[in-house]
Amino acid sequence: MPILLFLIDTSASMNQRTDLGTSYLDIAKGAVELFLKLRARDPASRGDRYMLVTYDEPPYCIKAGWKENHATFMSELKNLQASGLTTLGQALRSSFDLLNLNRLISGIDNYGQGRNPFFLEPSILITITDGNKLTSTAGVQEELHLPLNSPLPGSELTKEPFRWDQRLFALVLRLPGVASTEPEQLGSVPTDESAITQMCEVTGGRSYCVRTQRMLNQCLESLVQKVQSGVVINFEKTGPDPLPIGEDGLMDSSRPSNSFAAQPWHSCHKLIYVRPNSKTGVPVGHWPIPESFWPDQNLPSLPPRTSHPVVRFSCVDCEPMVIDKLPFDKYELEPSPLTQYILERKSPHTCWQVFVTSSGKYNELGYPFGYLKASTTLTCVNLFVMPYNYPVLLPLLDDLFKVHKLKPNLKWRQAFDSYLKTLPPYYLLTKLESERILASVGKKPPQEIGIKVKNHSGGGMSLTHNKNFRKLLKEITGETALRLTELNTKEFAGFQIGLLNKDLKPQTYRNAYDIPRRGLLDQLTRMRSNLLKTHKFIVGQDEDSLHSVPVAQMGNYQEYLKTLASPLREIDPDQPKRLHTFGNPFKQDKKGMMIDEADEFVAGPQNKVKRPGEPNSPMSSKRRRSMSLLLRKPQTPPTVTNHVGGKGPPSASWFPSYPNLIKPTLVHTDATIIHDGHEEKMENGQITPDGFLSKSAPSELINMTGDLMPPNQVDSLSDDFTSLSKDGLIQKPGSNAFVGGAKNCSLSVDDQKDPVASTLGAMPNTLQITPAMAQGINADIKHQLMKEVRKFGRKYERIFILLEEVQGPLEMKKQFVEFTIKEAARFKRRVLIQYLEKVLEKINSHHLHNNISHINSRSSC
C-alpha cells in the first residue's frame, strides 16, 4: 500500500503570480489534483494512502495524516493559505517523522536481524516549492539543515531521518510572471539548482525545474511512473575491473582494463523493485540482506545503521548456483550505469557475487549472500539473494540429498558445523531448522497426533432435552422476552453494540399503519417497483435518491473504492497473459480507469489534431472506423446521379459489388427474346415480363437493380461468357458439375448496331441444364455457404461468389440470401448481415419492378 505524502510550500513567496494570473499556490493545488487523477487510472491505486503536510510550525503542519480520509485531504488542500516562512528543513523532518510513526511497532526495520526487502512500506514524498531562499525565525539560511532531534522512540537506530523505502521528489516552480516570446524547448525536464536537489538525490529521488505548464504536466506523468514498490541500495565495486570482452564474446586479456579511473558504474545509488505476490498482493521473501556488523549479546546497544545498505559486488565471473528445494529471492534493478554495463557484456550465464562489509565474524569483507546476474534475454539485471555464504552451503546440501540420502557421515557434520560458525546469529530460523533436521536424521519421526474430538453420536443427552435449547425456543416463539441483562459481558469483552445510523430509513413493509401520510405515495411506488422487479434485491429507497450526493463529495472516489471487493487473482500467474486481439488490435483495456473530468490538456498541444471532417487533417484519411456496430453511427452512402433511375445510393459504395448475383443481360432495340415458348418484341424501350430493358441504355450493360454496371465489370462478364465450353455448358470451378443457364434463352443481336455485343460473338446461343443438376449444385453451394459464414475474418468475397452460382429463378436466390442471413445471425456476423440485407433489398425491389412492368404490359395490350 504506497503512501503518497505531499509537502506544499505555504510561505508568503507562493503568492507570486504567473503570466496567466494564477499564484504559485494555486498551481501547486492543481498539480496535486491532477496527480491524483493520473494515479487513479492505475487499478493499483485503490490501496494508496494520501497525506498532506505544509511549512507551518509542528504539529500544525500536518493537515492530513494517518487518521484522515481522502475527503479531509481534499478539503485541507483547498483551504491552504500562503502566509508563513520557508522552513523546508523542519517540514521535511516532520514529514519523515510522520511516515516513521508506526515503523518501530510494526517491526518493518527489523533492527539487528538483517534487512528484509520484502518488509517495506513504500512512500513517495512530493514537495512543491518555489525554490527561494530558506527562511526561519532566526533569518535566512544558505544551506538545508534537518533537525536531529526526533520525538520518536528508536529513531537513534538509524543515522538518517528517512528509510530505504522512502524517496523524495521536488517540483520547483520557476514559472515566469511575463509570457515568454521564445519558443518552448521540448525534451526532458532538467533538475533544479536549489538546496533541495541534493536531498532528493540522497533519498533516491530527483528534483524537477518547472518553467511552463507543459513541463509541469510532463513531470506529473513521470512521477506517476515513479510510484513503484522497492528499496534503495548503494552498489559499490570492490576489487579490480573485469577483463574486457572481445567481439567474439570471450575475454580479451590483451586489452588492459582501466581499474584506477572512476567509472559511473563503480558506484550506483538505485532502486531494486520488490514485486508483490500475485496471489496475496504482499511481497514474499526468504532471506535478508546481512547487517554491516556482527551482533553480539555483550553489546550495550545496537550500532546505528545507514538508511541505505552498502552492497559491494566483485567483478570476478562465477557460475550461478541454484539447487532444488532451496528458495531464493529475485529482485530487479532499476536501470542505471551498472545495469547498462552488465548488459553490454552480454554474458547471461555468469554472475558477480555481492557482499556486505563487516557482516562476517572472521572476514572483513564478509561472505557472499547473493549475486548480480543479467537475465537470459539481456533485458534487465537481477539481484539474487541467497543464504549467507551460499557457495559453502549449497554443495553441502546437495551432497546431503543426493550422496548421503539424508544420512550424513561424520565428515559432513564437521563441515556443516564449521559453516554454522560463519553464519550470523540473526539467521536463527535457518539454524534451528537445520539442527532439527540433523537431530532427526537416522531416527523415525514421531507420528503426528491429531486433534481428539468427542463423539456425541450416542450415549449423550439429546439436544431437545438441553435446558439452553428449550430456553432459546421459548425466546424465539415469544413466550419470554430476551433480556440483555442475561448476556455474559465477560464472554464478549471486545464487542461493541453498533449505534443507530440516522441516515438509514426504517423499513415500513410490516405494518401499513406505520407509514406517515405524506409518504404513502412514495412508499406505494417503492412497493410497486419491488413487486415488478423480482430479479433484483428489494430496495428501501428510490434509485435516484442514491445519487443525491452533495457537490463537494462527488469527486470522492477513494472511500467508494475501498468498499469494493478486491479483484480475483489470476488462475495461473506464471502463464503469460493472452492478448485481446478481437476487433481492433490497438485497443487498450479501459478497466480500472476512473476519470471524473475530461483532462485532454494533460497531453499538451502537441497531441491535438484537427477533426476528421477537416480537409487538411493528416489523420482524416487514416482514421479507422469503429469495429462495433453498436458504437458506430449509421453511415449514409453518398448520393450520386444514376443515369437510369435518377438519384440514389450506388450499390458499389455500400457493399462489395457482385454483378452476377442478379444477372445482367445484353439488351438492344429490336432484340427478340424467346422465353418459355413466349416470344415478345421489345420496342420503344418497354420492359418485358422477364424484366429486360432496351432503349433506355443502348450499347451498355445495365444491372437489373436499376444501376449502371461499372466499366471494370464488363471485362469480368466477358470472361465469364468466353469460359463457356463448346457444348453450351459451364464447368464450375472446383467441382465436376456443369453449370448452365436455368432458362432457355435465345438472343438475336445486331452486330453492326451494338459494338459491345459484337465483341461477344463467340457466345453460344443456348445454355442448358437439367433440374437434377441444378438441385445438386444448390445443395453443394448451401453446404459451402455454411462453412464460409463460420470462418473468422471479414473476407466475404467467397460468400457472394457462391450466391452468384445459385441455379434457379430469382425466388431461389432470395431464399439462399435469407438462409445466409440466418446463418450469419447465429454467429453474430453483423457486418455480413448488413451486406446481405442490402442484396436482399435489391432482389425484392427488382422482383416488385418486374411485377409492375408485367401488369403495365398486359394493360397496354
From Swiss-Prot:
Pfam families cross-referenced by the UniProt entry: Beta-barrel_INTS6, INT_SG_DDX_CT_C, VWA_2
Record-listed Phosphoserine modification sites: S617
Record Gene3D superfamilies: von Willebrand factor, type A domain
BP-aspect Gene Ontology terms: snRNA 3'-end processing
Region of interest: Disordered: 605-626
Domain VWFA, first and last residues per copy: 3-227
InterPro entries xref list: INT_SG_DDX_CT_C (IPR029307), Integrator_subunit6 (IPR051113), VWF_A (IPR002035), vWFA_dom_sf (IPR036465)
GO cellular component labels: integrator complex
Keywords for this protein: Phosphoprotein
Keyword Signal: no
The protein's name in its UniProt record: Integrator complex subunit 6-like
Gene name per UniProt: INTS6L
